[in-house]
């Protein structure tokens, strides 16, 4: 093989290795660092998420508003409310009207059950961000069998208040509602961007 060809192959190989190394570094740079408290924080946040679902499915409004900070915000298809009293008012009105959409064959309100699938949680000190896929099901299928109603994405901001994680903002996106869908991009990228902006003192820090 001519030496010129060997040199060209060597140059191409070296360029490929540098490219792969750069891609690897970029991928590593996108991964957040986890503190030694992360497992404990994540467990507490996952527990909070579960308590939210049990509260809404069993109409326990004291428990429901209790997962939000005093100045917390809830945003979903019915609108946006800030503060526990306003959140309670909005969500109870929503629950009272849900029978129009979910009901058994004899016309009674169906039993709704929410499920969280996977969650990505970013913790930075006493602030956290999360993205979770959720789905909703109810016994409003034929002969009152279970039927999946809708699904979507939770966009969460959390803060630690007196040693307890609480929602400072929960945004509920619904893939069945065009104006409330999550969009084509990876939601985790936006979550990490919000966390990085907070760390740098940008708009997300407010």
Name the predicted role of every residue range:
Residues 39-40, 118, 123-127, 184-206:
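Flexible low-complexity loop/turn motifs enriched in small/helix-breaking residues
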Residues 11-22:
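Bacterial N-terminal signal peptides
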Residues 61-134:
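A solvent-exposed, acidic/Ser-Thr-rich amphipathic alpha-helical stretch
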Residues 27-67:
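Short, low-complexity N-terminal intrinsically disordered segments enriched in polar/charged residues
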Residues 114-116, 148-154:
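Short, surface-exposed coil-to-beta transition loops
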């Amino acid at each position: 093989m001519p030496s010129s060809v060997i040199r060209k192959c060597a140059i191409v190989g070296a360029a490929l290795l540098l490219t792969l190394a750069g891609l690897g570094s970029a991928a590593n740079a996108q991964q957040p660092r986890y503190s030694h408290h992360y497992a404990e924080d994540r467990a507490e946040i996952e527990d909070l998420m579960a308590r939210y679902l049990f509260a809404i499915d069993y109409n326990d409004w004291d428990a429901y508003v209790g997962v939000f900070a005093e100045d917390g915000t809830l945003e979903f298809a019915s609108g946006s409310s800030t503060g526990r009293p306003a959140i309670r008012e909005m969500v109870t009105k929503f629950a009272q009207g849900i029978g129009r959409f979910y009901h058994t064959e004899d016309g009674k309100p169906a039993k709704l059950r929410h499920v969280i699938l996977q969650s990505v949680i970013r913790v930075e000190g006493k602030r956290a961000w999360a993205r979770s896929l959720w789905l909703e099901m109810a016994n409003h299928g034929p002969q009152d069998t279970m039927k999946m109603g809708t699904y979507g994405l939770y966009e969460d901001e959390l803060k630690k208040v007196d040693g307890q994680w609480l929602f400072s903002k929960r945004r509920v996106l619904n893939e069945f509602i065009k104006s409330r869908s999550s969009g084509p991009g990876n939601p985790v990228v936006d979550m990490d961007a919000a966390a990085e902006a907070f760390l740098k003192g940008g708009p997300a820090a407010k």
